[in-house]
Amino acid sequence: MYFYIETLKQRLDAINQLRVDRALEAMKPAFQQVYSLLPVLLHHHHPLMPGYLEGKVPHGICLFSPDEKQQHYLDSVELRWGELSAPDRKGELPITGVYSMGSTSSIGQSCSSDLDIWVCHQSWLDNEERQLQQKCSLLEKWAAGQGVDVSFFLMDENRFRHNESGSLGGEDCGSTQHILLLDEFYRTAVRMAGKRILWNMVPVEEEAHYDEFVLSLYARGALAPNEWLDLGGLSALSAEEYFGASLWQLYKSIDSPYKAVLKTLLLEAYSWEYPNTRLLSSEIKARLHKGEIVSFGLDPYCMMLERVTQYLDAINDQTRLDLVRRCFYLKVCEKLSRERACTAWRRQILTQMVQAWGWSDERLVMLDNRANWKIGQVREAHNELLDAMMQSYRNLIRFARRNNLSVSASPQDIGVLTRKLYAAFEALPGKVTLVNPQISPDLSETNLTFIYVPAGRANRSGWYLYNQAPSMDAIISHQPLEYNRYLNKLVAWAYFNGLLTSSTRLHIKGHELCDIARLQELVSDVSSHFPLRVAAPTPKALYSPCEIRHLAIIVNLEHDPTAAFRNQVVHFDFRQLDVFSFGQQQQCLVGSIDLLYRNSWNEVRTLHFSGEQAMLEALKTILGKMHQDAALPESLEVFCYSQHLRGLIRTRVQQLVSECIELRLSSTRQEPGRFKAVKVAGETWGLFFERLSVSAQKLENAVEFYGAISNNKLQGLPVQVETNHIHLPPVVDGVASEGIIQFFFEDQHDNQGFNIYILDESNRVEVYHHCEGSKEELVRDVSRFYSSSHDRFTYGSSFINFNLPQFYQIVQLDGRTQVIPFRSSALSHLCVTPSSEDKKNLVLSQRLQML
């Protein structure tokens, strides 16, 4: 037993040293320095060293002794400071070991790879862990200053025994992975300093009795407990864990598909073997115990590809097998079509592989030229990756059904994962599909041409985008890159996918819908308002309803009513100018509106509205996408491209939208029925702001308006005629007063409801017979509206006079018809000071009572 243990330790040390050497060989000098010094900087804590902060900061790595390069660094510090004090060695030091994991040291490591470092610490660290985390954060910043991307992960040595999981935002994948995270660590870990990993010493056949076997090794003195890092065994995985982990890999593959597709397929291979899955880490350990140092030194990336290849061959999926090989080749980043003198071992391995795959020189040249791929190749690659991921997703769903899963990932994590998949892949009208998730660094085009095809032609009407100058030969011989009915969508697609840049030459054939100057303005406005790179959506954002973050309202891009004013004399009064009901014809000067917005899930959406109701439809759409508890958009811009009155139209639209958004987001249960009237093309519309929705209703007359804002709408047969064609009760004629709105209620006999006579400010009359409902509620709602809505109307709307309406009841007293003020408790709480005209009318009504 002793000899066997010593042999295993020697193999472990040899494999670890091979991995360290390979890791350093693939690194640039700055990377090598950071990798070498990190253990020293975690072992010591000194003001002259990176990562220093005041306080009692845990430091010191168990069993650490510096190598030659590390000692040279320590000597240089001591020359400036004097002898460094060693960490307090009473008992165990706080850091059990420092390990790099992932692609580091494997064939998958490239010059641009980042470093994932596990800092495993004693369980008793507890409250001091936060200070160690701060030290690690300072070391990350120091490494970034050297051009090296390092991420530290603090790991309690008992974490996996207690089945603790981090949040979805971290690299440890939230609650969806536990054993699988440990599986990756065990197969890829490189010990930089500290204790050896105990799991490697336990034979695969003893995995089910891991703890008992470890105790027997300690009891027999074969191993000393304080010399080993024990994170626990790899227990059998549940189907739920495979499901959650696979969803997580799909989540990662959205932003970095080439990097994640291999891991995604490994998990699919695991689930295909379930319940008899043999983890890759266990296979590597079994070969280590047998002395079979295969797969180019048990390279974890090569072994991962081998396992995936076996699986895809078994299910006869040659399409995804070819894809995963290309992803592997691109991840290694060796460029075999070009001569190189460095990293010989990686180049030799990759050469053997591509020869076995039967790849041609042309394919190698194409893959090695990935940095210069343009939209055609990128779109093809995107579709291929998307198909592969969706196939993995379908297989995953079948796996879940086959095993009657109750998913172990928390509902919140699953919701976040599903939301991101939806946001990235669901194709919806108006949604801008982003086709370049780290596939190629530069999709910019030298020329972009936008061509409009009117209705009635062979091709469908709309806009076509070409990456050619507008010569007939070039256009005819090429397929369009993209088509859409509306120009805004094409510009957004080209901009957000990186084809349209500041150096792109723009061309347009717009059939008078849009010219080059307007197109250039649009591109400039969009690029200045929408940054291309934004932070990834947080798990909290993905778990919540999506909200508009950046909004652009694009006015009169394709249809500009003011273009008709050219060479005409247009008479208007600026003091009474209403761009939504302009001039004697009451014309709406907003002919088209395009919306362009990015939401909190980082989706980019476009919408188009045209015609006289474009403003109203756009308003309803914007407000409908804002739930009542949403945050205000971070930015809201109105871009107007009218030939005339551009500034005024832009200002009016901005004011209207801002007012409506404020009303929408401030509506509460305590104040239902918030309202705004908008006059468009001579017609007045009411926008009603409820907690759950925003509705619009055309208001052709006063009672339609009053009924609409009443919780208990009146029901009756409206009869609307001119004053000279109707006989009002004489008592109403006698009380009519210009300048205010007056309501007269007249009860019908035999419970047939009541009539309403309404006189507006000009004494125009509307009559409604046989109305039903509550007069009290009608009076209350109308009065509430008048007392609180002085600023709710757009410019030019004279639909309502803001003097408080007067309400009267027609009654029979002493055989005579009389008018008395309507007694309503609803009016008692309204603190409105009547105008002098109101006072005069009130006196008049009081006199009438006495007649």
Curated annotation (Swiss-Prot):
The record's region (Regulatory) falls at: 540-851
Any one of the GO BP annotations: cAMP biosynthetic process
Please give the Pfam families that the UniProt record associates with this protein: Adenyl_cycl_N (PF12633), Adenylate_cycl (PF01295)
Which InterPro entries does the UniProt record give? Adenylate_cyclase_1 (IPR000274), Adenylate_cyclase_1_CS (IPR024686), Adenylate_cyclase_1_N (IPR024685)
- One cellular component GO annotation, for this chain's record? cytoplasm
Primary localisation category: cytoplasm
Similarity remark:
Belongs to the adenylyl cyclase class-1 family.
* Entry protein name: Adenylate cyclase
